[in-house]
């Protein structure tokens, strides 16, 4: 019997498919799916529980209720399979057909499908070129529409109200035809001749001038073409037949007590059937028009509710006032089909339990409770018991397991040996959230976890739970062992650094072991070997921290892998000598001969991995952990209240600060400072007092005075427990110690502003009521933030994964010569990220030369590993062009060379690696560590903003970047260009620091001059913006009339008078058109020219400019003609943290973006309008001028007559990524986004490799805008995938035709995800209805390229181990499509072949 069923199951072969197509269903197609018409709204007979005939659950239509049994019970058993009972008409088959057989309802009047009507833009509306309002009025029987105008003056598609319709009837009689309702729309749609319309529109397009009209026609044309090419007919958007979902997918379940639980769909279907039957009856009775119309409208509404409840009008509600769940609601949203069931399936063979520490485990092990193991491995145990002959049947085996007989445990031991299990902790934010371990059976009920993997899981033991999953098949076990084993995941995929670094107690133990103490017991002893040190420590002759001399033996591994031993005597401590015992052979003792903090340990593990490989590192990590735990125990470090030593200086420092605050308060009361200045100064005073206190406290804590062997006092690092914990990186930080033993400091209100009275007490002294109350603000904000942050961070990760999920490495090398230029990142004067960190693991795109020569140092296509990076540093290279995924030329994927090294494995990336998902996880996972808030610039933060000079930190020579300058009368350089930068170069030409210098900066040194560290080399006034003269001569005021365009003001203190230019708004009518300026005249009174140009030297003065010169005064080059006061930049909120990252990836336009020059040329200002000024750029080559209106209040960086380059900043502000892409190109926008995102993460101390951000940027740049179509079938202004255009252009160029031209477009991640070619992926992301509507209209076919689509259809994903499967399938498919070439063999050839074969056979005898 069982075999028979198995045989039957095999008959239904699964179809091999290569894609999924979605389209509109024609009425005939719907009827062909159906197994019968549902005519009655009844569901089941409430007495007998049997389905009603011709009802919604009818067994005759949908299949039997019990397996192989008809409804009336005449035929039972399998032997009648396929018989149709003549009594009840039910086919004898399996019940599961009730999940797949559909029915249908023949609608008495056509009904519009709400998705094509209401989902914007309305497809029916576009098709008929009518507005949605008009169509709705027709559909819901409010007005008539003309279908056939005949010989009348009416037009097709014209709307007629009831009155106008009657008038027309009187006038024309039956010359014309007008109808209402869906029938009317159906006829209009049916009358459209697609081919003709498309042709007409294509001809019409080039001649359309109005932008909006052109857009509309293009949209309509696209829709028509979609219908035309897909073979969909427009009239199918109106339903004549409604399909009925199989009954088991909308179940009706009897509850106890005679009530029923039912799916909402049954209610919705019942409504439709009731109204449909009533309408049929009314039509048969030939009822009055108005009644029929009303019924038709109600039918339309009930079908709308069934398809998408609540889209039009009020949602239909059930008995409990809850809107009914329609078909559309079933598939969309988090609880919908896509996300709940297709992407988030549950698995069997899993369990979960609380986790505890397993300090004795090895890195590849986890402790599994026996109870859990027994349950998880049950089938394996049954099989083993039966195979051993210990149990005769499965039933017997079951009994044995239930009784927990002794043999069962032995069998269990065997079963789990070498059978890895997977442990997962939710939330799984990156791929290290699931790892495989070998189980070790333990007593108890908690899973034991190895402490070193906690960092990857972000787990702690305060009640966290973890899930265990068992890989069943051999392939799954193999993957778990080879790819997911915790020992294979030592490096983090986000930054390539070890992720299994010890933390907390282990760090403290190792740090304690490696510290030295002056005059410790045994100081000065000398040992012949480490073994001897061990003895001395064990016997107590020398203590752990004693400074001793030891002869050590080191193993040195040469480049060829040859090992040589070397002995030397080192000064070290007993503890460090003991640590050298666990150091793997091949590592230098110097690595542990230092204070081992968390950073040092991490570096040690990293070095070990790079030099000795995986196996040694894993063993070493375990040893480090055991040692750390051991010595942490021995150290006895603890936190006591006396450990928080309050510095004596604290009280005087606080008193001084209070005195200063009082002084400021007095100044404020006498009116010398404003309220704002007072507040800022007070906050500055307290901030610096806090710094001083904490400095004194740390000095006090971190050192202690001891007497050395010679009886002299000496300072040494203290052994204070709290200090050791913070210093080693085990727990706590200077900031936290400051709150314990210094002062709590300034606090913020809930709105983010700083309270000006700080908490001067610390936690050891205790807080008073007021201080405690102020503290609660911060604490509560922290909690609220955390909750918000988690949700936001999760949503960002989801969007990132969605945009990048289909990006996979598919070839070795795309051969491109493009790349991104990498330089060290320099901010202010510090190198934030050296070049080696930016290029490590990348591939060189353009040969790197030795500095100053033509010899190649690193040839193109070199993978830069650690050794190469050392070489680059040696030769002080400060710029390398590396390959990047942004410039990769591979279609529908990327190549290994453009990606470079797989960070988690340390070698070049493998084919099939899902780099998109890895990138998304690497960016999203630290999201929860980022802050949520927007920072107000105020108080302490505003000090840094008013810089007014450059003080260099390194010696070297001075170099200027894109700077124009003039030399003033003192022989100093004055900068007269905008975005100038100044750099300090060392003797090898490497850039050490770089600063932005504003217009009007005076340089103390000339270019190329030598500077010393600490020199101040540039000065400027941060509060005003000067206008610098570039020529010497006498000045002439133009249009400067007192009281009309300017006023004179006299300074009360100095008595000097100055001229202030009035703003245009403040001038009378006479002054409105005047343009005040200063002209420079030569000795003979003629205009002077700006050197090197034909432009006369005249400087326009904007409103509120201050001039301190008199008419006809003589001036020199580089003098300031006028000063424009800068408004103290309004306290703008800086968006920081997570929202900033989201803004960057969504490519949102900032509020007031910087204005960039659209073309290169000369600036001039045209006629001003109210509130705006007209900026005109005239290109040098005499092309078209570019005009732009700019609001008056924008601070412009340019003056009339200045030359600008395309993409240069004209008005300050945050730059918009779209502008950067348009005006400065793809490389600049990539650098901009990478650097901005990295700034946010760097602030939080999170390391992410640049290439992950680049992967996301590549996906944001996936689409392009067609600027001219050439001979392609694209439309101008259409948005197309770049790969598609490139492929099409390649074919066209090969044929000698005109290729299309395009502009790259930057889409935000949400937009890019929805614009993907795969409609399945887009629909499962967001806006399901819109995506599916669009796809259906276009008859789209999903080629299942990405990961998500394949998960949804239940296939292996085309990445990782599934990549090979997909590759072979695709190759086979390509082969099948190739024309078969038959090689004809000539006679002589055939003879020769035969002879060869015979010879071969002969030679083998």
UniProtKB/Swiss-Prot annotation:
Claim: ATP-binding is one of the keywords in the record: no
SMART domains: RPOLA_N
Name of the protein in question: DNA-directed RNA polymerase subunit beta'
Sorted UniProt keywords: DNA-directed RNA polymerase, Magnesium, Metal-binding, Nucleotidyltransferase, Transcription, Transferase, Zinc
Gene Ontology biological-process entries: DNA-templated transcription
Cellular-component GO terms for this entry: DNA-directed RNA polymerase complex
InterPro entries according to UniProt: DNA-dir_RpoC_beta_prime, DNA-dir_RpoC_beta_prime_bact, RNA_pol_asu, RNA_pol_N, RNA_pol_Rpb1_1, RNA_pol_Rpb1_3, RNA_pol_Rpb1_3_sf, RNA_pol_Rpb1_4
Superkingdom of source: Bacteria
Family label: Belongs to the RNA polymerase beta' chain family.
């Amino acid at each position: 019997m069982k075999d028979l069923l198995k045989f039957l199951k095999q008959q239904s072969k699964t179809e091999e498919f290569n894609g999924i197509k979605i389209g509109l269903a024609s009425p005939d197609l719907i009827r062909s799916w159906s197994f019968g018409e549902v005519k009655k709204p009844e569901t089941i007979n409430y007495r007998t529980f049997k389905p009603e005939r011709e009802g919604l659950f009818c067994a005759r239509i949908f299949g039997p209720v019990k397996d192989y049994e008809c409804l009336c019970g005449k035929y039972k058993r399998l032997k009648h399979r396929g018989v149709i009972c003549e009594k009840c008409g039910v086919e004898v088959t399996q019940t599961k057909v009730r999940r797949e057989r559909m029915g249908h309802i023949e609608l008495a009047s056509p009904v519009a499908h709400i998705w094509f009507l209401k989902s914007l833009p309305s497809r029916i509306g576009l098709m008929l070129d009518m507005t949605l309002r008009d169509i709705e009025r027709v559909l819901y029987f409010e007005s008539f529409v003309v279908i056939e105008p005949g010989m009348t003056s009416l037009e097709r598609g014209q709307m007629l109200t009831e009155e106008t319709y009657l008038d027309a009837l009187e006038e024309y009689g039956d010359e014309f035809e007008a109808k209402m309702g869906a029938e009317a729309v159906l006829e209009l749609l049916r009358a459209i001749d697609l081919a003709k319309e498309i042709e007409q529109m294509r001809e019409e397009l080039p001649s359309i001038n109005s932008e909006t009209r052109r857009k509309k026609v293009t949209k309509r044309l696209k829709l028509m073409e979609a219908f035309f090419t897909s073979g969909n007919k427009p009239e199918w958007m109106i339903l004549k037949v409604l399909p009925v979902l199989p009954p088991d997918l909308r179940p009706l379940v009897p509850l106890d007590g005679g009530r029923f639980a039912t799916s909402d769909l049954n209610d919705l279907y019942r409504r439709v059937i009731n109204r449909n039957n009533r309408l049929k009856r009314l039509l048969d009775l030939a009822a009055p028009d108005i009644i029929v119309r009303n019924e038709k409208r109600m039918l339309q509404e009930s079908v709308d509710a069934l398809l998408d409840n609540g889209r039009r009008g009020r949602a239909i509600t059930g008995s409990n006032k809850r809107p009914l769940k329609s078909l559309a609601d079933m598939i969309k949203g988090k609880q919908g089909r896509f996300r709940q069931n297709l992407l988030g399936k549950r698995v069997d063979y899993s369990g979960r339990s609380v986790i505890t520490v397993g300090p004795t485990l090895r890195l590849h092990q986890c402790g599994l409770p026996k109870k859990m193991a027994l349950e998880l491995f049950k089938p394996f145990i049954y099989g083993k018991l039966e195979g051993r002959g210990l149990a005769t049947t499965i039933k017997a085996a079951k009994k044995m397991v239930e009784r927990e007989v002794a043999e069962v445990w032995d069998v269990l031991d065997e079963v789990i040996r070498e059978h890895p299990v997977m442990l997962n902790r939710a939330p799984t934010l990156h791929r290290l959230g699931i790892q495989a371990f070998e189980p070790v059976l333990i007593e108890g009920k908690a899973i034991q976890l190895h402490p070193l993997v906690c960092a990857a899981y972000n787990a702690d033991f305060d009640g966290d739970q973890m899930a265990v999953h068992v890989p069943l098949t051999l392939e799954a076990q193999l993957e778990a062992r080879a790819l997911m084993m915790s020992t294979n995941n030592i490096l983090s995929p986000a930054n390539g650094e070890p992720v299994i670094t010890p933390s907390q107690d282990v760090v403290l133990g190792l740090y304690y072991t490696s510290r030295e103490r002056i005059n410790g017991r045994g100081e000065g002893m000398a040992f012949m070997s480490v073994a001897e040190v061990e003895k001395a420590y064990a016997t107590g002759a020398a203590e752990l921290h004693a400074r001793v001399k030891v002869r050590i033996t080191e193993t040195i591994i040469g480049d060829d892998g040859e090992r040589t031993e070397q002995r030397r005597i080192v000064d070290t401590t007993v503890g460090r000598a003991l640590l050298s015992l666990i150091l793997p052979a091949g590592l230098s003792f110097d690595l542990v001969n230092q204070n081992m903090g968390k950073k040092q340990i991490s570096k040690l593990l990293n070095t070990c991995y790079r030099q000795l490989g995986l196996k040694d590192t894993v063993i070493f990590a375990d040893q480090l952990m055991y040692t750390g735990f051991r010595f942490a125990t021995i150290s006895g470090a603890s936190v006591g209240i006396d450990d928080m030593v309050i510095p004596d200086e604290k009280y005087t420092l606080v008193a001084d600060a209070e005195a200063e605050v009082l002084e400021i308060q007095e100044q404020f009361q006498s009116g010398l400072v404003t309220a704002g200045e007072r507040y800022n100064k007070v906050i500055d005073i307290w901030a610096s007092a806090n710094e001083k206190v904490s400095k004194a406290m740390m000095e006090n804590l971190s050192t202690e005075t001891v007497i050395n062997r010679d009886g002299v006092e000496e300072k040494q690092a203290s052994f204070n427990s709290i200090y050791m914990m913070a210093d080693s990186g085990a727990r706590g930080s200077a900031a936290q110690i400051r709150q314990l033993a210094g002062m709590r400091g300034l606090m913020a209100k809930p709105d983010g502003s700083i309270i000006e009275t700080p908490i001067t007490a610390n936690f050891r002294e205790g807080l008073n009521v007021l201080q405690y109350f102020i503290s609660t603000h911060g604490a509560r904000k922290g909690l609220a933030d955390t909750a918000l942050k988690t949700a936001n961070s999760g949503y960002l990760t989801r969007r990132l994964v969605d945009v990048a999920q289909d990006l996979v490495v598919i070839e070795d090398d795309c051969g491109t010569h493009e790349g991104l230029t990498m330089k060290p990142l320099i901010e202010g004067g510090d190198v934030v990220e050296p070049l080696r960190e930016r290029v490590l693991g990348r591939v060189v795109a353009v040969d790197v030369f030795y500095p100053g020569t033509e010899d190649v140092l690193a040839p193109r296509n070199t993978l830069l590993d650690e050794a190469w990076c050392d070489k680059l540093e040696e030769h002080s290279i400060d710029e390398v062009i590396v390959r990047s995924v942004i410039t990769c030329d591979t279609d529908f994927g990327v190549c290994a060379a453009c990606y470079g090294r797989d960070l988690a494995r340390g070698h070049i990336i493998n084919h099939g690696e899902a780099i998109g998902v890895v990138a998304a996880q690497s960016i999203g996972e630290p999201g929860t560590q980022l802050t949520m808030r927007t920072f107000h610039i105020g108080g302490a933060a505003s000090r840094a903003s008013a810089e007014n000079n450059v003080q260099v930190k390194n010696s070297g020579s001075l170099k200027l970047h894109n700077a124009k300058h003039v030399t003033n009368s003192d022989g100093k350089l004055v900068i007269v260009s905008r975005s100038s930068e100044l750099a300090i170069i060392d003797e090898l030409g490497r850039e050490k620091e770089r600063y932005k210098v504003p217009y009007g900066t005076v340089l103390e040194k000339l270019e190329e001059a030598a500077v010393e560290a600490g020199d101040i080399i540039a000065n400027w006034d941060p509060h005003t913006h000067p206008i610098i003269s570039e020529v010497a001569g006498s000045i002439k005021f133009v249009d400067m009339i007192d009281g009309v365009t300017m006023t004179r003001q006299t300074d009360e203190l100095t008595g000097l008078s100055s001229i202030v230019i009035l703003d245009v708004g403040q001038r009378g009518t006479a002054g409105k058109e005047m343009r005040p300026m200063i002209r420079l005249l030569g000795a003979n009174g003629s205009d002077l020219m700006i050197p090197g140009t034909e432009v006369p030297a005249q400087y326009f003065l904007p409103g509120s400019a201050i001039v301190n010169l008199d008419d006809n005064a003589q001036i020199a080059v580089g003098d300031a003609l006028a000063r424009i006061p800068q408004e103290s930049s309004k306290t703008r909120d800086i968006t920081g943290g997570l929202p900033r990252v989201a803004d960057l990836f969504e490519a949102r336009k900032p509020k007031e973006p910087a204005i960039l020059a659209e073309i290169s040329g000369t600036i001039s200002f045209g006629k001003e309008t109210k509130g705006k000024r007209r900026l005109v750029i005239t290109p040098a080559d005499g092309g078209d001028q570019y005009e732009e209106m700019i609001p008056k209040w924008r601070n412009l960086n340019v003056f009339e007559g200045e030359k600008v380059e395309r993409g240069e900043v004209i008005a300050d502000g945050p730059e918009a990524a779209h502008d950067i892409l348009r005006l400065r190109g793809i490389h600049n926008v990539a650098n901009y986004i990478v650097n901005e995102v990295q700034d946010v993460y760097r602030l939080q101390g999170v390391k992410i490799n640049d290439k992950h951000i680049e992967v996301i940027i590549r996906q944001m740049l996936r689409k392009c805008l067609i600027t001219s179509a050439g001979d392609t079938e694209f439309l101008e202004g259409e948005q197309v995938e770049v790969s598609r255009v490139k492929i099409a252009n390649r074919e066209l160029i090969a044929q000698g035709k005109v290729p299309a031209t395009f502009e790259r477009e930057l889409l935000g991640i949400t937009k890019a995800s929805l614009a993907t070619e795969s409609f399945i992926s887009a629909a499962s992301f967001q806006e399901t209805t819109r995506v599916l509507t669009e796809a259906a209209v276009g008859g789209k076919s999903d080629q299942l390229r990405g990961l998500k689509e394949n998960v949804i259809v239940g296939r292996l994903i085309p990445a990782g181990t599934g990549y090979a499967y997909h590759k072979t399938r695709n190759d086979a498919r390509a082969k099948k499509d190739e024309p078969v070439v038959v090689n004809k063999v000539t006679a002589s050839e055939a003879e020769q072949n035969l002879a060869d074969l015979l010879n071969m056979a002969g030679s083998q005898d």
